[in-house]
Amino acid sequence: MQTKYIFVTGGVTSSLGKGIFSASLGRLLSDRGLDVTIQKFDPYINVDPGTMNPYEHGEVYVTNDGAETDLDLGHYERFLDQPTSQANNVTTGRVYMEVISKEREGAYLGKTVQVVPHIIDEIKHWMLKLGETGDYDVVITEIGGTVGDIEGQPYLEAIRQLRNELGPRNTMIAHLTLIPHLRAAGELKTKPTQHSVKELLAHGLQPDTIVCRSERSITAEVRRKISLFCNVEEEAVIQMLDAESIYEVPLLLRDEGTGELVVDRFYPKRGDENEKCSDTPDLSDWIGFLKRLKNPEETIPIALVGKYVEHQDAYKSITESFILAGVPDEVQVEVKYVPSEDLSPDTVESQLGDVAGVLVAPGFGDRGVEGKILAAQYAREHDVPFFGICLGLQCAIVEFARHVCGWDGAHSTEFDEDTAYPVIDLMEEQKEISDKGGTMRLGQYDCRIQDGSRAHEIYEADMVQERHRHRYEVNNVLRYKLLEEGMRFSGVNPDTDLVEIMELPDKRWFLGVQFHPEYRTTVGDPHPLFRSFVRACTAYAHEEDLVTSPQPPERKAVPLASVDM
């Protein structure tokens, strides 16, 4: 059976939710029995987002095979409950690098290398790569940015060519656009959408469906108008309203008939040629999850101490992991964002004294590091549940070395090259590397869990695999003194003996990890470390009277059908 391709473009403005739409559509098709994957093309010149400032880009999401990617891949994995790879995120910089490398190798036989055909052909190669594996029935391809952006034009040309080569029954274009409501006029305006589609048509692309992002329900008249002036059928004009939770969007799209629109086009004779594709999606698990999500029994406060908390997309996978970890136990986590720069001995009590747990987030650079160290100290001394991720683990070890081992000035060589007690040091294989991009310890590595440890109790396994993104590690030369003072290193890499997990056995829940468990949380399978941490925080919240009644989120959209909720 030939792989089908859905191309998702955007118009009028960025940040419309193409990633959430793609993930939600993928879930609707997956729940019909189809094998689906989603990829994203980013038009920027960076080879990957690994060296970009989180204020510019948000979180860098890491795949099993070590790709540093856009945060939308986190949405794809969480919604579809399956991993992505290097082939799921491609940038213009990567495309050009591949083409230039081929030219240097003589692959083009002396021809003049141009955008057409060479850059376009490289884009088409990556668009088809996942489908050619034979593992997927449907590949959804999201194009970053908006129609009309100069940097996006090669991608539109690649789609035009593929649509011609693969045929209309094997391709589909979904165009997301904004339908603004003008309060003064008291009506929804379609003109921006008309101009956006006109721009798409100028590139030789006729959208098959128009997805209308709006704060208000679009009327039948608005649908007819968009249908008439944008050359699509009325049933192909889909509204995608603002929702209380991104996890409601699959049901909102289901109610709009989005799944039927796709399968009727791709599989018109489902009973004969494709028994794998069912007529209706089985969303029972999703609906059960959403019921628990929207009806929690209690709310607990957890502090997220980080450097970039003003831009919450920088910690997107962590905040989503909190949400998903609480759902099975019907607990709503209220995240208190604490800028690590604001923490001092004078402010730490006011900032952390009213939370049920402290998570110290990953990061780079020395700004705010002392605040993170102070947060770890406060949690240890007050026996507040503590979870340190990547740099969070390193800060907890620095704090322990200073105040338990008595090593005054102990630090990481990332921040103090001359420290007398370099408890955190650059990994040996990193010392000869000068390039920044794509050179960290990236991707999935093994972690052997010590029997009898809290980590073993949580994982219920002797060996696990987790994703990494770091250059610095616990210094094994000083590690054994930390052990003597009561710290336990309950997880290590079996090949390199690098520390992966640290815990303090005498505390109620004090654990740090060098890897990033937030990258392995999905709707169907919240990460066990986050689940255990949230449970420990819930127990502490009950002891300290920090539990509150759940606060309903501000209602921004029509409620879901009562048959679901």
From Swiss-Prot:
GO molecular function, a single term: metal ion binding
Positions with a binding annotation for UTP: S14, K189, T190, K191, P192, T193, Q194, K225
Catalyzed reaction equations: UTP + L-glutamine + ATP + H2O = CTP + L-glutamate + ADP + phosphate + 2 H(+); L-glutamine + H2O = L-glutamate + NH4(+); UTP + NH4(+) + ATP = CTP + ADP + phosphate + 2 H(+)
Keyword terms of this UniProt record: ATP-binding, Glutamine amidotransferase, Ligase, Magnesium, Metal-binding, Nucleotide-binding, Pyrimidine biosynthesis
Pfam families with a match to the protein in the record: CTP_synth_N (PF06418), GATase (PF00117)
Inhibition and activation profile: Allosterically activated by GTP, when glutamine is the substrate; GTP has no effect on the reaction when ammonia is the substrate. The allosteric effector GTP functions by stabilizing the protein conformation that binds the tetrahedral intermediate(s) formed during glutamine hydrolysis. Inhibited by the product CTP, via allosteric rather than competitive inhibition.
Disulphides: none
Protein name in the entry: CTP synthase
Species of provenance: Salinibacter ruber (strain DSM 13855 / M31)
Protein encoded by which gene: pyrG
